[in-house]
Amino acid sequence: MSSLSQQLKSINEKTASVALDRKSRSKIHSKSLIFDPKIASTQDYDYLYQIGLEGLEDLIEIDSRFSKFKQTLFSETTINLDRNVQTQDTLDQLNKNVEVFLSLVSPYYLLTPSTKAVEWLIRRFYINIHNGEMLLLTSLPFYNSPVFVKILNVIPKNQFPKIFEWVVGYKDLLKSPTSSSILKSFHNDAKFFELYSKYLMDQLNNHAVFKEQLVFYLANTVQLVASFTHNLGQFGETYLPVILEVVGKLLLAGSKFSSTLRNDIMLTAYSIISVLSSLVPLSADLVKSFTESILQDPTACDSNTRKQTVIVLGQLWNFYNEDNFEVDCFKNLPASKLVQDDLLKNLIEEGYKINKLLVVYFASNLPQIDAFKIFDFINVDKSETFFKIVTSKLLYYAYNNQDEAIRAKLIEAFESLLRTNKELFVKVLQNYKDGLDISQLEMQLMTTLGDSNIENIHDADIELEDEEEEEEEDQAVLDVDFSDVCNSLENYKTSTTSFLNKSSDEEFTKLFQAFAEKSRSFNIKSQKLILAKFSKAIFVSPEASISFMLRVSFTPSVPLSIRLLVLRFIKLRLKELSLSEDKIDTYLLAPILLLGLYDTNKSVRAGFAELLRVVKDTTSKFHGNKKKVKTSLFMEDQIYGNTEPSKRAIVPPQDGLEMLNVLIEDSKSILDDTVIDKSRLNYVLFQVLFKSQKSGQKKFGQLLLKTFILNQWTLPFWPIVFKYKVWNIISIENNSNGGNDDRFFFIDTDLTDYFSNRDDLIEQAKASKIDFENDVEKAIVGLVGGTSSNDKNVNKEADWLLKALEAPNKLQVAAGKRLSSVFTSFTSIDMRAKLVNKLIELLINDGDDSDNLVVDPVEVLQLLDMDHETIISVLRNVQIVSQIPEQGIVKRRRRSSNSTKQAMARDDISSIAATHLKKLTIVLDLLEFNLRKKTSDIAKPDLLQNLFRILTDLDYLGNDGNLPILYAQETLASCMLLSIVQMKDNSKSNSFKFDSNVVRADLIVNSIRLSQSPQVQNRLLLVIAELAALAPEIILHSVMPIFTFMGAHTVRQDDEFSSSALQQTIAKVIPALAANGSSSLSYEIEFLLTSFVAAFQHIPRHRRVKLFTSLTKTLSYKHSLHIILFLMGQQYSNNITRNKAHESISILEFTSAFLKNFSAQEQLEGVEKFYQLWNQIPNAQLEPNSDEFNALSSRSIFGVSILSLSKSGLLTFKSQLLNFIDKVLDSDTQNDFSNLPSLKLKIALILLDPKKPAEDKSDLLNYFRKVTSFILSSLDTFTNVSRNDVLLDNLYALLGNFLDLLPLNYFIDSIIDSLDCDQISNTLEIKIAKNFAILASRKIENELNANNIDDVIEESILQKLLPVLNKGIKKNLDIELQQAYLNAFSSIVNKFGGSTHLLVTQGNTEALINSLNIITSNSGLLSEQPEIVISSINAITSIVNVLGVKAIGLFPKIVPPSLNIWKTTTASEDESSKLLQASIILLLACLIKKIPVFMTTSLDSIFITILTSDSVDNTVRSSVLQLIVEHMELSQVLKSLCNIWNNKKFYQNDNAGNLGLYLNVLQSTIERMDKKSASSQSTLFMKWLIQAFEFRHYAFDENNKFDNNTIHRLESSFHSCGASYVMKLNDKSFRPLFANLVRWAVSGEGSNATGNTELSRLLAFFKFFSKLQDKLKSIITSYFSYLIDPVSSILNRFANGDIVDINLRRILLNSLTSSFKYDQDDYWSQQSRFDSICSPLLNQLSNIEPNIGKYLVKCVSSFISNVSSEEYNEKLVHGLIEFISNENESTTSNTKIWTIRTLKTIFQKMGEQWLSYLPTLIPYIAELLEDDDEEVELEVRNGLVRVIENVLGEPLDRYLD
């Protein structure tokens, strides 16, 4: 930019708010965030300052930092400060203050105070002009809020910041920008993104950032990064540095923010980093830098942010692709934080990818001990790379770290890697440095890698070498220098004589570590020599040395190579002993060596087998012959320790040799099996060795050898490396046989001392790498329990298990599992109960000491195989009340409530009761579980009796002790229920007897009533139900209380369980009562149903139908369905009486849905029995104590409440019952949401199905006969005996609805006799017949259709019903009956005629003609009763509709009488007249459709009839009139329409609506007519048109009969009709007619009106002519020849004032304008026509009315435009000058003004064509400019002159001058 442009821009910015005029100042001042511009422009600064200050004060309350602006931007001195006159320094400071304020206020833009404060800055300092960019930056996060739109609005468009130009479009639209537009601007303009990013960093520096701003930046940055995924090069160059700078700033934001905002800032940075790392490849340095920055924040590892920190680090490092996994950026991330609160575990479970992060972290933090906390969470299984990295790092520190704690962690890690992938682990070892194998690693770590869960990890078993090999190897190592090793061994010399004692643990560990340390650096071959030297140098004797070596070989933690080396060493030493002169026997080692055969490693087992062979060889050498040799026993003291000699079960040498011979044969040793499979050792010992025999000693193996071996194995001081193998061997044997007495060898030693030694054993196991839980504790527990006859020892075992269950450790779990497996082996019931009670006590104490309880007692209890006796014993132990100390002697079994409450008031007793309640709950849970398993025969009467006692006790505790017994009650009820069900199932094989004093139904009923829990109540009801089936005699005496409770409570519950319990109870109690032969069964059922129905409103709505349906089916519909209907009817009656409409509807809906669940026969039988009950209700009040009264009052369904009603009350009640059942039957067929078929459909399916048995149909019809007979007899009673009209109406309705259920043919057959007039003899029969006829009509209407009309239906209706109806119509017995017959007749004919062609057959046609004769006689159409006439017309209509032209013979009997009848209705407005008119019109419509040709003669009368039937709706009449147009000859229709208007004076009708209908049908007729017909009737139509045009005058003469609006509407219709007709004519036919019309308009020729009608004629004509002009346009222009002279004359008369009619003048001018406009043939340019119209037209200017002057201007300008020529223009100019010249004295100001406006319009239209006449007009224009009338002057100056100047292109002043 040039320096000049820079200077100009600077000047422009400084002066942008400078305004030089008032308008500009007002515009600048009107920019406001709060006020409308008009209001804002008038406000002063004092007022604005007060608003701004008020806002600032409110902001100060929110943030005190705003207070500093009180002295600057909001100082009172700023009211008079004008920034446009300030120095540059002042402006710089002002801008700085504004920017700081805007930055600070930006979070509060949505608050009113901030708007007020910013309003002051905008209005006073014009920050919208000078600080617009900052204003937009601070408000941009609120882009979608109204305040941002306001800010856009106040920034002037010409001052809009260039970088924000993208938002100008939204400013113009006053709309918020979209999020996509903002993203687009960031994407397209890197400078804009950089600007906002720097602004955000400034906000962070100023501690003014806020949540919305962070969200805004994050959302856009994330989308921005995503948008550049295909153009990362550009992104990396332009945007990435900016984003990285912002992220760095966010991560180092500092701690001055609130904790919430600090978290928001941190999460914003994390989110951006996450997106960047996933979409943009980040360098390793950047990843490390991000990590350091993230962890540099001290809050990054806080509890509320730690998770997010690890997630983002995980995602960041997941894309790290460098080989170097050792980094130093995690120093601020301690491992303890990562594992705290299971963070890593939860993240891994949630699927977050953090594995690579953990690998890098672990590799970077080794060998720190904390790093191993992370190792367990690293998954190396799926990544070979990770596996190699981790393994290599661990190997490095295994060889380069001496810390013992690190070594232990390394061992755990290596074992984990081995479990994960053994093959890969071995491969990594082989590739590490010079190559390693697992044995070398074990030597380095001095431990065995792996456990029992890992298969043999060595590539091949290491076999013991022979002596020859040893000699070669010894020779090979002679050159190795062992001097240093030998010298150092002297320091470890020990005096310990035996290492087979656990007291030597410490010494053993110390010596082995010394050996391991010394031999670690040597190879295996060298280690052999070192071991020999070690043995000689350290131990005091060979025995001590061998004991040490044996222990080493048994210790799993010792590397395998060392163990094998030691076994080889032992083998050599034992061989040396065999060659010794001291004759030493080594067979005492056999039991120990046998244990070696149970090792997990095959090579070790093979080593021990070799040792046994050596021992066998030695023993055989000394004792192989029969000669006795005296020998010493090797290692006796080391093996037996301090054990008394008498307790050492040592076998003689010969027996020892025999034992070894059994184990090791010459050819094949059975020990070979154990070498292959260690589990074979049990077989070798217990099936071979211990069962071996020796001559003379049958129990040699069973007694002697077993005692010898087990005596050693039970030695308590042996180290765990020996004992755990012993325990496992004996445990397996004990469990495999269901119990073995060999286990008792250990009961007084190992088992008894186990609890005290357990902690030491754990430490020993850990040191030796023995799995304590599986290999020690499981084996120990396995020694306990099993079948045995030794009750003393069994009791000891039970006590041991009890003690184990109390142990505060995992021993509980093992003991619990063991107890569940050996529980049945305890034969003592008391012992079983003791064990169960112990588990219960543990469960009770769980809450008090839950930390020490590891086992789940509930699980153990459920695993126990309980029997009946044990359950009874446990139950007796928890009878609660018997445990409560009584204060006094109880004399009754049932304790008084008062005494119990007193006892329970004591705290100690209450505590005891609560504890025992817990016990009871557990026992009941246990009992329920076992009952549900059905694994044993637990359920017996004594169990039930105990449960009943507990039920009573619970009632006491719940009601008197206020203890929470609900759960216990519910469980108890379940137990009782299950036990009864099981006893019932077993009742076929067992007969049960119950103690009636204990097992009592009243106890259950009492508990039900006392309980507040619906669940308990329901379960106890089920108990009653099942008990009723098992022992009905128990519940017989408690039936009524049970039913009462169910009706009052259970039915109200809204759950499936309650519903099920209710149904099951009834289903089993009622049959039990019936089976018991109860005579009162029906009364009990009535009582039950009464209870249930009484609670109907409280039963959940959606359960009612299912409940009562189930109830009915359970009780049998024969016993219950009618009772439910009767009781529901009572409920309905009560609700109707109390005006409870909603409840009444609810009852009807329920009953209808309820009945649908039963078959047709069941429903009908229920209805019949309902009527029987209804009939039992007396018609009058009964005498109290009478037999009938007593009989009814004893029944719950009647009761005193009904019998106490008065006579009227009883009759009302009976009436309402009838109304109820009637509505139920009526609603049966209505649509509902049920999928079940209605009763009507069910009946039809039976009666109409030919496959149904005849018996079923007969039974069904029999029900109809019974009910019908009953209703008819009731009708007779309430008609002749005790008349009651309400009851009669209900009975009639009921009879109709009931019979309506029958299929149509059955229905007709059932009513045909009642309709026969020959059998009607009294009023009752007439009424019945009438109701049947109405019902028949309705049924035929609803049910008859083309699909269901068959021969049966046809015969029933046409052959049976129709003749009966004809006979009844002809006889005319009663008006209502006659009407019903006629209506039924109409329905039949309409249905059959519309659905089939059966009625047009010859026979049926004759029958209909005969019927028509009857109906048109005095019995029908000619009757004096309007009702009968209406019905007759309907019947005639139906017949005509069917027969059509075949009915023409009776035309004279139909149409003329009908029209005559219509005439009688015109003078009356009653309802019958309306109905008559409507029916007659419908009859005419039918005739017009069916026989239109024959209706032509009566067309005038038909039109008059239809058009003047005011009582009939217009839409009906309009549709009938449309039928006439559609079906009749249109020329006749038009002729008739014109005739009734012209000749019959229809226009005189007083109803404008009728005239409208007339014109509508005329319009339709014209539109449908063809041109030929229209031309033929044109003369007649023109006569009509002329007469129609005179309608206005007629209305005026009739004292303004219609208002102007009505007349205008009618005239508009006249014109539409006329115009439409003209469009049907050609020019030849229309011209003469038009000429006639003109003559009528001008001279009145052919007018029928009287008086002076000239103006009305002209007005009507020109309105019509204008409409024609709009339609025909130029076609009709030439027709003006007929009008030129009349128009000129009329115009002159207007100019002279002879005629004054504004409307006519306007229409005339518009007509001329249209003619000029549509003139395409220079019609008006013809000289004579121009001369004829020019002057008259211009003369209108002389006196034109102001309100129509514009029409004249338009007319004149159109005329001039049309006739434009020099000759005509000259004449027109001078003609116009005449009306503006002052020389014409008659010219008025009004004339001048309209002439000036005319000239202005002419110049606008003609343009330069009229400039040539300007010199002529200039003098007159100048004259007008000086006119005395100011209005004239202004019109010229502002109108004409400006137009001329626009055309001229220069000012007119010089011409005027």
From Swiss-Prot:
Main subcellular location: nucleus
The UniProt record lists the keyword Membrane: yes
UniProt key word Amino-acid biosynthesis: no
Membrane topology field: Single-pass membrane protein
Sequence ranges of the HEAT repeats: 1817-1855
Residues annotated as transmembrane: 267-287
GO molecular function: U3 snoRNA binding
Disulfide bond sites: none
InterPro entries: ARM-like, ARM-type_fold, BP28_C_dom, HEAT_type_2, HEAT_Utp10/HEAT1, U3snoRNP10_N, UTP10
Family membership noted in the UniProt record: Belongs to the HEATR1/UTP10 family.
Function: Involved in nucleolar processing of pre-18S ribosomal RNA. Involved in ribosome biosynthesis.
Self-association state and partner proteins as the record states: Component of the ribosomal small subunit (SSU) processome.
Stated name of the protein: U3 small nucleolar RNA-associated protein 10
Organism expressing this protein natively: Debaryomyces hansenii (strain ATCC 36239 / CBS 767 / BCRC 21394 / JCM 1990 / NBRC 0083 / IGC 2968)
